[in-house]
């Protein structure tokens, strides 16, 4: 696991964050690049926010967002 790698978590604020043991959660905001685990590998994607009709955060590549997925902050993960 790299120093930027952790697990994806939905925060009380409604934003997704990469959480690492002993570290403050790193919230992922609209426009941020991050890596998410898909089929056992980390893939680079970008977070966006949809205002309607289904309000919420999503990845531009359509990757599912779920608690406890392996994820990494930044472009280089």
What role is predicted for each listed range?
Residues 41-77:
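Short, compact, well-ordered microdomains
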Residues 15-20, 34, 55-59:
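Short polybasic amphipathic segments
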Residues 1-26:
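Mixed-charge, Lys/Arg-rich low-complexity intrinsically disordered regions
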Residues 11-13, 28-32, 52-54:
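A short, compositionally biased
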Residues 1-3, 37-46:
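Short coil-to-beta-strand transition motifs
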Residues 6-8, 35, 47-49:
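Assembly/interface hotspot detector across virion components, adhesins/toxins, and nucleic-acid enzymes
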Residues 24-38:
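Short coil-to-beta transition motif at edge beta-strands of beta-rich domains
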């Amino acid at each position: 696991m790299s120093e930027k790698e952790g697990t994806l978590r939905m925060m009380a604020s409604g934003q997704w964050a990469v959480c690492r043991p002993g570290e403050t959660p790193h919230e992922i905001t609209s426009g941020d690049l991050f890596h998410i685990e898909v089929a056992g590998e980390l893939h680079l994607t970008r977070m966006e926010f949809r205002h309607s009709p289904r309000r919420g955060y999503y990845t531009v590549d359509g990757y599912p967002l779920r608690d406890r997925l392996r994820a990494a902050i930044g472009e280089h993960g």
